[in-house]
């Protein structure tokens, strides 16, 4: 049950929310975002809003169906530990696997040939068994699944899946849309457009409008002419579509791929191809409807499953798709003035000052934002989907590791761009737009940023929305998934040698400085020195933690450290508001953030944490003490979080949780103690890394 608490301990009278499982966080409505740029580009007289279903807990609209299907199964006696079979592929398979992980169900998923190709690594990590059948249709696969379940004497979820999709979207998706109408956040809906997978979701939405007497609302389902786009048209229930008057429209595969890439780069909507196809048809529909109409597009899923698919230029070329590939961006000149490399990343811009009485902080150059805990149903842009991430209590892992206290994790991978770095990217851009520091931002200007990846994704997202060009310099060890995610948002990516120190002209910092000197009016926001980095976490992240914990006293906060902005900003706010709480920073062996200043280890695999210098954004005095981390334990814990709790987190998240549990045991924290751990990002960027058994085995991380 969701816990609603009144925060007495921390001085607030408002209610905060924590969730007992990640599945409870699925009850949060997904936001609506208007497509402003595309409206102008296509000279539309109607408004199109997209519903960001990829911000669900497992990344798709199918999460709603999977949750409801298991609820139906539990009502007839399925319990934790039972074995269940289901037929599903693609994003739906991940949704069922995630719900099964949370509920402790032993799940076997059957699917036609090829339906696991984009998701098999994630499914394996979630602990489900997959059976690929030599059939071409889901109808045939369902028959085989049901027969196999009957022979083994286990439950087949197939009897509920269609009804679950219908009911979940009738009771939740459609209702969330109508709440936005009732709140006058959007105009009366004239049409809802949705990708057709089975069609049951579209039928459920149509049934909702029919049930409330809104017979004028058109529900339009979109499918692919040749059934070649993932998540589209492979398992249609045409009888349902006819019964509830769902219109069908078709798109060409290559047209959908091209448009979806354009949608991502123009609006920052990180959607999968079926979602892009639906938006494309919504634009065509908008030209048919009366001026002033409102169209809502329900997005099926996001980019996670497609980073080695239609978003990858290599895949486009290999599969001979009629899609324009990206052009190479600028490279720094080989001859440069050494003076451009004069730079000190250890000095923070401006000064922080603490009031000796209130203990609150201020900054000499930046006006602070007031914290607002509300999560609107309708956002101005996708950048407003950054923040307000859920705080979830771990149910199984602490006990399995001998920890008595309560451990809550803040799921930052549910930010719009997929990580906690979205926050600092947004804040640094806001500050530059308002103050002109560290450079003036106007549409068309070039942002350049050296980063390990996640800040680059956040800045690429902000640049797409705000109309800036973006160049990201990044070490080669960072995943290809990160590079493709940034490129899909319109950024140019330049890779640099892993071994190059920060002061080398060939490092990601050195290359960024050289490019800045060569590109007119280019701006380096500089996450290592920019006050917006710690400020984003002081103003927002820490406030969210305190607000959501309510009257549950916080004893310990555990944070991984990279640029230092996260640990500095959160620690300052926590110490200001809860003086008795302790904050622990986690730093990998091979990094010098927590010391020693010199180390024999010069390489570590966990991405996004640690550095070979002390950034200006890091205030080491704000941290009570440090823990040094190892790769193996970090990755194994991340996998355990995925499999045992259904929390689809990245390697640095595993790092934070592993060392949080070690600290809980070291301190012998009692059952009533509360620990908060921040999970920086999710699995999207690491599917070919720590989620892959071969990658883990090559590094001996799976050795006993």
UniProtKB/Swiss-Prot annotation:
GO-annotated cellular components: cytoplasm
Induction notes from the record: Expression in the intestine up-regulated by prostaglandin E2 (PGE2). Expression in the intestine and body muscle up-regulated at 15 degrees Celsius.
Pathway note: Amino-acid biosynthesis; L-cysteine biosynthesis; L-cysteine from L-homocysteine and L-serine: step 1/2
This enzyme's EC code(s): 4.2.1.22
The keyword Amino-acid biosynthesis belongs to this UniProt entry's keyword annotation: yes
Cell location: Cytoplasm
Transmembrane regions: none
Positions with a binding annotation for pyridoxal 5'-phosphate: 454, 562-566, 652
Coarse class of the protein's main subcellular location: cytoplasm
GO biological process: cysteine biosynthetic process from serine; sulfur compound biosynthetic process
Coiled-coil features, chain-numbered ranges: none
Keywords assigned: Amino-acid biosynthesis, Cysteine biosynthesis, Cytoplasm, Lyase, Pyridoxal phosphate
Listed cofactors: pyridoxal 5'-phosphate
Reactions performed catalytically: L-homocysteine + L-serine = L,L-cystathionine + H2O
Effect of gene knockout: RNAi-mediated knockdown causes developmental delay. Larvae have shorter body length. Larvae exhibit homocysteine and cystathionine levels about 10x and 1.6x higher than normal, respectively. Knockdown at day 1 of adulthood decreases longevity at 15 or 10 degrees Celsius, but not at 25 degrees Celsius. Decreases production of hydrogen sulfide (H2S) at 15 degrees Celsius.
UniProt entry tagged with the keyword Amino-acid biosynthesis: yes
MF GO annotations: cystathionine beta-synthase activity; cysteine synthase activity; pyridoxal phosphate binding
Subunit structure: Monomer.
Function summary: Hydro-lyase catalyzing the first step of the transsulfuration pathway, where the hydroxyl group of L-serine is displaced by L-homocysteine in a beta-replacement reaction to form L-cystathionine, the precursor of L-cysteine. Plays a role in maintaining homocysteine homeostasis. Involved in cold-induced somatic longevity mediated by prostaglandin E2 (PGE2) signals from adult germ cells, perhaps acting via a role in the production of hydrogen sulfide (H2S). Required for normal development.
Family membership noted in the UniProt record: Belongs to the cysteine synthase/cystathionine beta-synthase family.
Protein name: Cystathionine beta-synthase cbs-1
